[in-house]
Design a protein with these regions (language model features):
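Conserved nucleotide-cofactor-binding alpha/beta core module
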Residues: 81-149
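Class I SAM-dependent transferase core
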Residues: 1-93, 109, 124, 136
Length: 149
C-alpha cells in the first residue's frame, strides 16, 4: 500500500495504523487487516466523524444526547483484539457494545460475536452500524452484562 496514492479517508486510516497502532506493538497481520477493512468512521457518531482516526476516546452521543459512554482510542481497540488471539472458529461474548465497532473488529477475527449493551439507544445505533457495514456474524442484545449472560 502506497500512502501517497490514497484518498483522504484511506490516508487517515493508513496513518492511524502506522502512527498509533503499530507503535503500540499491534503487529498481528489479521488484526491490522481488520483495521483496514472495518470502516471505523462509519461507527462514529456523525458529528465526530472527522475525529474517527484520532488517538482519543470519542463520546457516544445519540441525537445530541450524551450516553456517558465512549468509543475507545483505536490503539486500545486494536490491542484488545490482538491480545484475544482469536481464530475463525472462536465465539466471543462482548459486554458493552457501544457503537458496535469493537464487535465488528472481533467479528472479523472470529466466527460469531454476541455483544450485550445496557443502553437501548446504543443497541439500536450499533445494530444500524453493523447492518450498514454488512457485518452478519455479530448479534447485539439488550441487557446488563453484570448479571451474567
Amino acid at each position: 500500500m502506497n500512502a501517497s496514492t490514497l484518498p483522504d479517508v484511506e490516508q487517515a486510516r493508513f496513518n492511524m495504523v502506522e502512527q498509533q497502532i503499530r507503535p503500540w506493538e499491534v503487529l498481528d497481520a489479521n488484526v491490522l487487516q481488520a483495521l483496514f477493512d472495518v470502516r471505523r468512521e462509519q461507527f462514529v457518531p456523525p458529528a465526530l466523524r472527522a475525529l474517527a482516526f484520532s488517538d482519543l476516546e470519542l463520546p457516544l452521543e445519540i441525537n445530541a444526547v450524551n450516553t456517558r459512554q465512549t468509543m475507545l482510542a483505536p490503539k486500545v481497540e486494536a490491542r484488545l483484539a490482538q491480545e484475544l488471539q482469536l481464530s475463525k472458529s472462536d465465539c466471543v461474548l462482548e459486554i458493552g457494545t457501544g457503537s458496535g465497532y469493537q464487535a465488528a473488529l472481533l467479528g472479523y477475527l472470529a466466527q460469531q460475536v454476541t455483544s450485550v449493551e445496557i443502553d437501548s439507544r446504543l443497541v439500536t445505533f450499533a445494530q444500524q452500524n453493523l447492518q450498514m457495514n454488512n457485518v452478519t456474524n455479530v448479534k447485539v442484545e439488550t441487557g446488563d452484562g453484570r448479571n451474567g449472560w
